[in-house]
Structures are given as C-alpha cells and as structure tokens.
C-alpha cells in the first residue's frame, strides 16, 4: 500500500521523500500545473511563494533550528536550499528545478 501525500510544497516534498527513503511506495498529488493559486508562478514542486519562505539560518532562531534538525535527519529541501542559496523569492525557479530533479 502506497503512502499518499497531498501537495508538493516544502512539507509535501519532505514527507514524500522521507517515506520513499524508508522503502515506502509514494503517490504524490499536486494541483499544478493544472491549477494555480494567485501566489504560484511555476509548475515545479516546492515553489517558494513568499520572500521569507525559509526564514533565518541562525540555529538560535526557531526557523534556523528547525532547518538544522531537518538537515541532520536527511532533509531533501534544506541541503538544496543551502546549495542554491535560496534565502529570498526564487523568481528563476532554481530551487524547484533542483527539487524536481533530486535523486
């Protein structure tokens, strides 16, 4: 039986990746590219729709600590965000392209 994940945003991509890494079959459902909200511009997964989607990097902050914990637990998105330096709105969709091409 497959794990079903609804939505390929940051959380959905992380959930699908974590399940797949643990040997689960995964069905990942995403409304794009058939349907968009006013905030969406890219057909790719994990689209960063606001300028501070990933927030602070400092581990003294809640957001920074969460990202550090996620990275240590095998996150898909955090290492890619660090490699592509995604700290602001990703108008060129580099982050989403990397998520869709991740192995």
Task: Describe each model-derived feature in a short phrase.
Residues 1-11:
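Beta1/beta-strand and adjacent pyrophosphate-binding region of the FAD-binding site
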Residues 1-2, 51-53, 84-88:
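A short, structure-level motif marking secondary-structure boundaries and short turns
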Residues 11, 17-80:
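N-terminal FAD cofactor-binding segment of flavoenzymes
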Residues 13, 64, 97-101:
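Residue-level marker for well-ordered alpha-helical positions
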Residues 69-103:
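Feature captures the FAD/FMN-dependent oxidoreductase FAD-binding
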């Amino acid at each position: 039986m497959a794990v079903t994940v609804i939505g390929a945003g940051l959380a959905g991509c992380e959930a699908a990746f974590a399940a797949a890494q643990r040997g689960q079959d995964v069905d990942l459902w995403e409304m794009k590219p058939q349907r968009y909200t006013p905030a969406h511009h890219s057909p790719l997964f994990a689209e960063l729709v606001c300028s501070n989607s990933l927030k602070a990097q400092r581990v003294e902050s809640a957001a920074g600590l969460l990202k550090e914990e996620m990275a240590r637990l095998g996150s898909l998105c955090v290492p890619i965000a660090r490699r592509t330096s995604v700290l602001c709105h990703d108008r060129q969709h580099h982050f989403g392209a990397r998520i869709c091409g991740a192995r």
